[in-house]
Amino acid sequence: MAKPQVTILATGGTIAGSGESSVKSSYSAGAVTVDKLLAAVPAINDLATIKGEQISSIGSQEMTGKVWLKLAKRVNELLAQKETEAVIITHGTDTMEETAFFLNLTVKSQKPVVLVGAMRSGSSMSADGPMNLYNAVNVAINKASTNKGVVIVMNDEIHAAREATKLNTTAVNAFASPNTGKIGTVYYGKVEYFTQSVRPHTLASEFDISKIEELPRVDILYAHPDDTDVLVNAALQAGAKGIIHAGMGNGNPFPLTQNALEKAAKSGVVVARSSRVGSGSTTQEAEVDDKKLGFVATESLNPQKARVLLMLALTKTSDREAIQKIFSTY
């Protein structure tokens, strides 16, 4: 029986990192090429026919919208090929959740797409990357992974792209899905799903980036006591088409900042309220009258994922009500 064909797209990150010492935390992200990365985990060749491609060699703090577009278009090209059964993306963990969510909304296939990374570089004494990659291949070739949307595989857990977020700066169990929990586990290659994301994704998503070369500028502004209008005005002057306001509590702005955001909304910039709190939803019509002020509530998306969705929404419309519907849907 022929083995499934899987393409691994490498973007860099800690999983491709290398340092001078196995017992020190310093390293260079993206220093290891995809060929060397795959050669370090020979057991994956028993599972599938593996092909590797280098998309970028960066730490994920260097991720850009242009790389997202390049990545999404390449994933769509690969999955349109009959012989390609799944795609895995090796990625730094800093912005993995944003890349995963972007792909969740722009990939046009039911075939599995898995993002995987590491919290310790390959030169570390207890590197987590090799097992994470081995598990990612097992998830990718498992039939139950079909039509699950894009997933993240880290630390023996499977997380839906929409829900996953990085909650710890250094621990190997850095990822969680605070509002919903993980959707499955993978233990030494044994895959088990408990549930799946219920929000539209991949083929059910309305977003088409096939002809898009650049995404609209959207800035995130972080709320705090004694906040001002300075950052709002700076975002407008920089040409932002949208602003994500990471508000206090249920997405609440400081009064002076709220006045500036209201003016921005009236000028045609889309202002979306999110929260700096780590879980829960930013609800419509609570302390802030969104309809009156012209704001959008991002519901259960954190600020960084709300930015991704707003960037895509702005490729279709700048109408407040239409964008609110998009946030309520995705």
From Swiss-Prot:
Occurrences of domain Asparaginase/glutaminase (ranges): 4-330
Enzyme Commission no: 3.5.1.1
Gene Ontology molecular functions: asparaginase activity
Binding site for substrate: 93-94
Pfam family, one: Asparaginase
Keywords on record: Cytoplasm, Hydrolase
GO BP term, pick one: asparagine metabolic process
SUPFAM superfamilies xrefs: Glutaminase/Asparaginase
Localization terms from the record: Cytoplasm
Catalytic residues, chain numbering: 14 (o-isoaspartyl threonine intermediate)
GO cellular component: cytoplasm
InterPro entries linked: AsnASE_II, Asp/glu_Ase-like_sf, Asparaginase/glutaminase-like, Asparaginase/glutaminase_AS1, Asparaginase/glutaminase_AS2, Asparaginase_C, L-asparaginase_C, L-asparaginase_N
Top class in the EC scheme: hydrolase
Keyword Hydrolase on entry: yes
Reaction equation(s) it catalyzes: L-asparagine + H2O = L-aspartate + NH4(+)
Family matches, as SMART domains: Asparaginase (SM00870)
Protein family according to the UniProt entry: Belongs to the asparaginase 1 family.
Assembly behavior: Homotetramer.
Protein name per UniProt: L-asparaginase
